[in-house]
């Protein structure tokens, strides 16, 4: 008898909300030449086919920077740059066109595969390329002629939408024509960024050699706001990094984010299944650039009762929290503050004020097990403290049996029962023997 594993079942169940959320949405995927050259590229193609099969409208933009550099070296043509931008003379343009054309055919062929025993079996994907992007020359800067290096003049977004409506994947490369019939070399990041903006895409997705943006300790930064992303760009450029996949993508992501693209995701092209893990799990695997954090701290309402109960029940069963009925929670819901991530309540706390004694109780503090190693507890404490001050309270107290040291680290000090509000003293459970700790809000 075959062993039955629930891992696949659990994973599929958790991914269903994201499958439903992404269906019919438009994503622009930026594939740099480094990603295409990597041995994991066939897996990325398979995952793109998977996204298409789930009803996601896809525009794939590819670059060819390393392939162009190799071809130039083979032909003994020295690459020329001005202000970190390639100068594309006539000889270089021919190399660019050859490299980009080869990649277009290769990507189209890979997406068109329909072999048995492959992820694209029976997919029958239509891949469409065309003159959707019209270019214009960069011109002359400081006396330097960029020749056939160009920038976008306009995008025929209506034509692209028609192809997406017909369930095709739109494939766009780094070479575009002008109204005069000339060809120009564009940067893939500009093409992807402007396409995402013009198409009003929900996501811009890019790849780099690392798992995303990393901090000083080497940990992945899961989320950046545009200003934070700009700081990262400046820090990388001070080290001489102007062309890495990370820098190029972050530049585009900041622009896209500020022009209406909801989220931009930076992933590793070396990690198998990175795009699937990023898009179909709550926490993802890379770095996303967003105008507004995926997590929201807000006051709870009646619709949050189910999520709060699901969060606190395990802690009540362990005796860490005092048991609350649904009815009690409904009556006290206005006292609660929650942290919500993708419609999941991941933390909560309540504030019960005793106005006459200018003190409040912080109670029912709970954090989802997957997020306890982070700073959600501190976020809740800060929010509850702010609410207490706004109410004119001078102190906060907690009753706890397990988290004594954590609260002491945050400035709470042990106290006796006579320091509690008179009403709370009468309700104190001597069998539970909770420790009493008090925070002076004016000494934070």
From Swiss-Prot:
User: Residue ranges of the N-acetyltransferase domain?
Assistant: 295-434
Highest classification ranks of the organism: Bacteria, Pseudomonadati, Pseudomonadota, Gammaproteobacteria, Enterobacterales
Q: What is this protein called?
A: Amino-acid acetyltransferase
PANTHER family listed in its UniProt record:
AMINO-ACID ACETYLTRANSFERASE, AMINO-ACID ACETYLTRANSFERASE NAGS1, CHLOROPLASTIC-RELATED
For whether the record's keyword set contains Transferase, the answer is: yes
**GO cellular component terms, semicolon-separated:** cytoplasm
Q: One Pfam annotation, family name?
A: Acetyltransf_1
Part of which pathway? Amino-acid biosynthesis; L-arginine biosynthesis; N(2)-acetyl-L-ornithine from L-glutamate: step 1/4
What gene is this protein a product of?
A: argA
Instruction: Please report the organism this UniProt entry assigns to the protein.
Output: Proteus mirabilis (strain HI4320)
Q: What EC number(s) has UniProt assigned to this enzyme? A: 2.3.1.1
């Amino acid at each position: 008898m075959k062993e039955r594993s629930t891992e696949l079942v659990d994973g599929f169940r958790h991914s269903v909300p994201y499958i439903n959320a992404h269906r019919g949405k438009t994503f622009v995927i930026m594939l740099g030449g480094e990603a295409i050259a990597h041995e994991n590229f066939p897996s990325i193609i398979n995952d793109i086919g998977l996204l298409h099969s789930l009803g996601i409208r896809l525009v794939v933009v590819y670059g060819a920077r390393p392939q162009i550099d190799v071809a130039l070296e083979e032909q003994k043509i020295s690459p020329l740059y001005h202000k970190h931008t390639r100068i594309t003379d006539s000889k270089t343009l021919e190399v660019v066109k050859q490299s980009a054309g080869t990649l277009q055919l290769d990507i189209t062929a890979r997406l068109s595969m329909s072999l048995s025993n492959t992820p694209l079996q029976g997919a029958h994907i239509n891949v469409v390329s065309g003159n959707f992007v019209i270019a214009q020359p960069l011109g002359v800067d400081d006396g330097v002629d960029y020749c056939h290096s160009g920038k976008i003049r306009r995008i025929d977004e209506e034509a692209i939408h028609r192809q997406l409506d017909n369930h095709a994947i739109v494939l766009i490369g780094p070479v575009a024509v002008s109204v005069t019939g000339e060809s120009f070399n564009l940067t893939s990041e500009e093409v992807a960024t402007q396409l995402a903006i013009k198409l009003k895409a929900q996501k811009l997705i890019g790849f780099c050699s690392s798992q995303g943006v990393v901090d000083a300790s080497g940990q992945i930064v899961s989320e950046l706001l545009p200003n934070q992303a700009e700081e990262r760009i400046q820090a990388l450029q001070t080290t001489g990094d102007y062309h890495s996949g990370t820098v190029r993508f972050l530049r585009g992501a900041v622009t896209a984010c500020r022009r209406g693209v909801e989220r931009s995701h930076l992933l590793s092209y070396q990690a198998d299944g990175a795009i699937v893990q990023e898009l179909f799990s709550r926490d993802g695997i890379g770095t996303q650039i967003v105008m507004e954090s995926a997590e929201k701290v807000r006051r709870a309402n009646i619709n949050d009762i189910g999520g709060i109960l699901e969060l606190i029940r395990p802690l009540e069963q362990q005796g860490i929290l005092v048991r609350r009925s649904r009815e009690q929670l409904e009556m006290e819901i206005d006292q609660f503050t929650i942290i919500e991530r993708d419609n999941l309540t991941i933390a909560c706390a309540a504030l019960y004020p005793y106005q006459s004694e200018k003190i409040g109780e912080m109670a029912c503090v709970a954090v989802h097990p997957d997020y306890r190693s982070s700073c959600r507890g501190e976020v809740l404490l800060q929010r509850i403290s702010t609410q207490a001050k706004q109410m004119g309270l001078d102190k906060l107290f907690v009753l706890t049996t397990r988290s004594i040291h954590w609260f002491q680290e945050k400035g709470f000090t042990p106290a006796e029962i006579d320091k509690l509000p008179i009403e709370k003293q009468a309700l104190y459970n001597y069998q539970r023997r909770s420790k009493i700790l008090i925070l002076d809000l004016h000494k934070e």
